[in-house]
Amino acid sequence: MNILIVESLSKEYIGSLNKDLDDGNYKGYTPFLDSLISHSYTFAHSFSNGLKSIDAMPSVLASVPSIPNPFVLTIYSNNTIKGLASHLADKGYDCSFFHGAPNGSMGFDAIANTTGFQNYYGKKEYNNDADADVNWGIWDEPFLRYMAQTLNTKKEPFFASVFTLTSHHPFVIPKEYEGKFDKGTEQIHQCIGYTDMALRRFFETASKMPWYENTLFVITADHTNYQVAYEKSKTTLGRFAIPVIFYDPSGKLKGFEEQRTAQQIDIMPSVLGFLNYDKPFFAFGFNALKADSLNRNFAINYFNGLYQIYQNEYILRMNSDLSPEALFNYNKDPLLLNDLKFSLPDITGKMNDLGKAFIQVHNDRLNDNDMTTR
């Protein structure tokens, strides 16, 4: 089991997830991910639950969203939670987290420990500063290779997650790769090309290892990046639009979901469902891989004082008092200009009820330190 969290991987950067752009001619900056997506299960509409790197780990690895504030910065960060690593450790998995920054950076080692990882591999364990940039840590390509090689020393079953870093501001790549990737229109674009290449080489290395065929890979982003070129990516929806990709080398899990939404907090329950986990667990998210969940799944996040609820092709904005602010059909109205709140009162009311119920349960669980199974 492997989860790859890619720094600043906005959905806009992936050509195969943006076939509507440039009259269908948009290529994006991730040729490897485009090829992988054609053999994966992914979503037309998938979202982050936050806008910061520190929001991502609790969301992706423990199904705990950061609404309205980053969970790890709240008084509830000391609550008892049971992340994916904890659940898999109960089944005998060796669980390791990888991040190429200096150990302690952004508190990732502490969050990894809280969510159940037994082992942490950072810049210290990598132990070769010649492969580090001057800003964040070890370049993605050698660090992902290091992860694959380290995993090859593990006894199965194991679970690993990695948080990449090269595509973070100031958007620098190794000198030997300068000029090898499309510079596009934004400074980040060649960084995304570099990280995409690093992912390709990771999968090439992993594919030669005995554990590869038995491993489910999940690829997502920590959050979007402000460097986007298209107006739909600058909306309050676009600010959260990221990929959520499930890749099973055996080919048993393939498809492109165009209606059902997915979000970061859905990753843990989806993985546990796919692995036929047979113990009770608590998650704020849903199993996004379940075909019968079309009318139950929705996504949620928080931006500039408004909650945002996504279901099917609609996005509902809710005020801080949990009253509906505006409703949009983001398939037909990608720039979110035509408010449908009054013309579609039934949908507005249903989605508002979903949002209120979720927020009430979320707040009660946090206040009561009740974030595990009873």
Could you describe each region identified by the protein language model?
Residues M1-R374:
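Solvent-exposed soluble domains appended to multi-pass membrane proteins
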